[in-house]
């Protein structure tokens, strides 16, 4: 059984980098667009530096899905620039573990965690259907095909 846990610690970006690249590898040719590929590579390099020197920008919480000792999915919850919100980024699942509900479990854990801190989750995504199924609502739609979405806990407070 794959376990999902929340940890306040750094994740080895080399281990996480492979999952990030798999998650953005969604073109019909099986390759990331070059611009996205470069952005992902740069972000992974930044994460490696942060990991190696122990520097953490705003507080981050990692939601990890492991199959025994193997990292098979994760999400990162971090302080948002908006008061009362956490950003949820890099929800990634190993391609061999997809369609088992891990992405939903990771996202639900993030929403539950934010609620314990009296916060809401805000995400920017190109997969709004996935988050709508979990109760998120669209706050804005951008011409680029990306959406800004809010967690279900916010609706309950309005």
Predicted regions and their residues:
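Conserved active-site alpha-helix within GNAT-family acetyltransferase domains
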Residues: 119-121, 125-146
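Conserved acetyl-CoA-binding loop-helix of GNAT-fold acetyltransferases
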Residues: 93, 99-112
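A short beta-loop-alpha structural element at the N-terminal edge
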Residues: 2-21, 28-31
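Conserved beta-strand in the GNAT
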Residues: 62-64, 70-79, 85-92
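Active-site rim helix/loop that mediates acceptor-substrate recognition in acyltransferases
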Residues: 20, 24-62, 66
């Amino acid at each position: 059984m794959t376990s999902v846990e929340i940890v306040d610690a750094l994740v080895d970006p080399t281990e996480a980098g492979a999952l990030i690249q798999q998650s953005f590898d969604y073109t019909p040719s099986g390759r990331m667009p070059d611009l996205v590929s470069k952005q992902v590579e740069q972000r992974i390099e930044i994460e490696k530096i942060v990991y190696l020197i122990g520097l953490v920008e705003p507080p981050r919480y990692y939601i990890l899905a492991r199959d025994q000792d193997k990292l098979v999915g994760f999400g990162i919850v971090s302080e948002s620039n908006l008061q009362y919100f956490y950003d949820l980024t890099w929800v990634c699942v190993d391609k061999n573990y997809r369609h088992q509900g891990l992405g939903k479990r990771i996202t639900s854990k993030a929403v539950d965690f934010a609620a314990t801190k009296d916060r809401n989750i805000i995400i920017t995504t190109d997969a709004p259907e996935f988050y709508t199924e979990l109760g998120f609502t669209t706050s804005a739609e951008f011409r680029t095909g990306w959406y800004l979405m809010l967690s279900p806990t916010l609706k309950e407070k309005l």
